[in-house]
């Protein structure tokens, strides 16, 4: 019965409108009483989680907090490989049941959401050590610190002299209504996709970027349709991971084979 209820809740389009509205409201107000109660589902944090540390360097860059498709770590490695005067680190929240990618600092979701001590220590470590921070997907790098407001956390870093920019990844800023209008193949048109919350999230994040007034990067060029002022930062692909020695020198039969593992499965 519990499994059936979980499946029913997972298919948001099958829920009554008032229930969907209530779920969306809690998601949009994480520091409300229902939002605080919802955060308890992440569990009790264990103490002693480390914070970000950099190697000695002229410029010290943190990329956080989602590491979608391992790109946060890949970008950090690319920065260090390009310029020896840069120490780059990434931090990612570990979500049970989600995709697992290597990161310099992996923080359990219970710590990220509910450990005020870690949130404060991480902020202080970054504010005193980093020269640059790249905030991924407009998610708050320090969990629920200061009301879980990304703009407040960014402003606090800027006030401490840290240069902050944003990295938009996809659903965080891609407006479903616009995407459906311009592409008949839009995945947002799939009946299994719950569009209202995604539309709300994209509009919220677009407004956040406007308020913050910081530089913005996008990981795929199609996002320039939603964030026209952004700069494209290409994703990093390690060809060695995809190499197939058995096919070297052999003529491939049939069409090109491509593996696709989305960061968020619908």
Q: What label would you give each PLM region?
A:
Residues 206-240:
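Helix-loop-beta element that forms the nucleotide-linked donor phosphate-binding surface
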Residues 106-111, 140-150, 180-185, 191-192:
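Short, flexible/disordered intra-domain loops and linkers
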Residues 14-140, 159, 172-179:
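N-terminal pre-catalytic "stem/leader" segment of glycosyltransferase-like enzymes
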Residues 178-197, 228-253:
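Short, flexible helix-coil linker/hinge segments at the edges of structured domains or between repeats
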Residues 113-120, 145-155, 197-206:
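Well-ordered, non-membrane alpha-helical segments in soluble/globular domains
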Residues 61, 244-266:
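Conserved donor-binding/catalytic core segment of Leloir-type glycosyltransferases
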Residues 87-92, 133-135, 162-168, 216-220, ...:
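A structural signal for short, well-ordered beta-strand segments and their strand-loop junctions
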Residues 154-156, 184-215:
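Membrane-proximal helix-turn-helix segments that form the acceptor-binding/catalytic region
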């Amino acid at each position: 019965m519990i499994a059936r209820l979980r499946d029913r809740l997972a298919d948001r389009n099958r829920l009554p409108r008032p229930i969907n509205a209530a779920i969306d409201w809690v998601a949009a107000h994480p520091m409300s009483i229902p939002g605080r109660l919802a955060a308890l589902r992440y569990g009790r944090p264990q103490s002693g989680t480390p914070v970000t540390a950099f190697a000695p360097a002229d410029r010290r860059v943190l990329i956080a907090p989602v590491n979608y498709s391992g790109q946060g770590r890949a970008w950090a490695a690319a920065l260090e490989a390009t310029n020896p005067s840069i120490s780059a680190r990434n931090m990612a929240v570990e979500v049970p049941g989600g995709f697992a990618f290597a990161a310099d600092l992996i923080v359990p979701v219970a710590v990220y959401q509910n450990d005020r001590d870690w949130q404060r220590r991480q902020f202080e470590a970054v504010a005193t050590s980093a020269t640059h921070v790249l905030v991924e997907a407009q998610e708050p790098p320090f969990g629920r610190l200061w009301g879980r407001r990304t703009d407040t956390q960014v402003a606090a870093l800027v006030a401490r002299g840290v240069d902050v920019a944003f990295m938009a990844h996809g659903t965080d800023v891609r407006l479903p209504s616009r995407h459906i209008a311009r592409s008949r193949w839009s995945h947002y048109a799939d009946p299994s996709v719950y569009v209202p919350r995604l539309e709300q999230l994209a509009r919220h994040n677009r407004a956040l970027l406007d308020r913050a007034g910081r530089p913005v990067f996008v990981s795929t060029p199609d996002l320039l349709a939603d964030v026209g002022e952004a700069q494209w930062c290409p994703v990093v692909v390690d060809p060695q991971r995809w190499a197939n020695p058995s096919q070297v020198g052999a003529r491939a039969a049939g069409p090109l084979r491509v593996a696709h593992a989305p960061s968020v499965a619908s």
